[in-house]
Design a protein with these regions (language model features):
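Non-catalytic, polymerase-adjacent accessory regions of viral genome-replication enzymes
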Residues: 1-66
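Sequence-level motif detector for i,i+2 pairs with an aromatic at +2
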Residues: 6, 36, 82, 94, ...
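Residues at alpha-helix boundaries and the short loops/turns that link adjacent helices
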Residues: 18, 31, 105, 117-118
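Active-site-proximal segment of RNA-dependent polymerases
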Residues: 26, 115-160
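Short, charged low-complexity intrinsically disordered segments located at boundaries
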Residues: 36-42, 55, 64-73, 96-102, ...
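Reverse-transcriptase-like RNA-dependent polymerase core
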Residues: 41, 70-93, 106-114, 141-149
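Short, conserved non-catalytic motifs in the polymerase core
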Residues: 45-58, 79-106, 122-134, 154-155
Length: 160
């Protein structure tokens, strides 16, 4: 069984070379990926939030990982519905928020790690949204370092 970093490194290399992904579903049987995903998720404030079941990060164990892998091997895994709650926004309106059960969060993080390792190197370097170590600050930094100003400004009204 390959370690997480070894496998994700191989995926990055395949992504850089444009080689196709192969046997990805089988990698969902790798317990090292789940332990790494757990390490990324357990620090989040929402890790202790319950979904439709009482399952939280506290219930995590290697036995739980083995149980998830066993169900995946038999292709019987069923995603559970997310608990829908509404949280208040600053303007007084409410925003819906889906709270999945812990095992779904964990499996989704494993899948995200695999897909990110393969596809992230294929994305544009100018894309900053929803990517690791990128965001609005890196976008602003890129604008600051590359924008040279403008020579012309055209203002007008186009009508029929």
């Amino acid at each position: 069984m390959q370690t997480t970093e070894t496998y994700l490194g191989l995926l990055r290399e395949r992504g850089k070379k444009g080689l196709p992904l192969q046997r990805v579903y089988r990698q969902l049987f790798n317990p090292h990926l789940y332990l790494t995903a757990y390490g990324k998720l357990y620090r989040n404030a929402g890790a202790m939030t319950r979904g439709i079941t009482s399952e939280t990060v506290d219930a995590m164990s290697t036995e739980k990982i083995k149980a998830i892998i066993t169900v995946l091997r038999t292709e019987q895994y069923q995603w559970k519905p997310a608990k829908r709650v509404y949280i208040l926004k600053r303007n007084g309106k409410k925003r819906p928020l889906g709270m999945p059960v812990w095992s779904d969060k964990l499996l989704a993080e494993v899948i995200r790690m695999i897909l990110t390792a393969y596809y992230d190197c294929q994305f544009s370097d100018h894309s900053h949204g929803f990517r690791e170590e990128r965001g609005c600050h890196t976008a602003l930094q890129e604008i600051y370092s590359t924008w040279k100003g403008c020579t012309w400004i055209i203002e007008g009204d186009i009508s029929d």
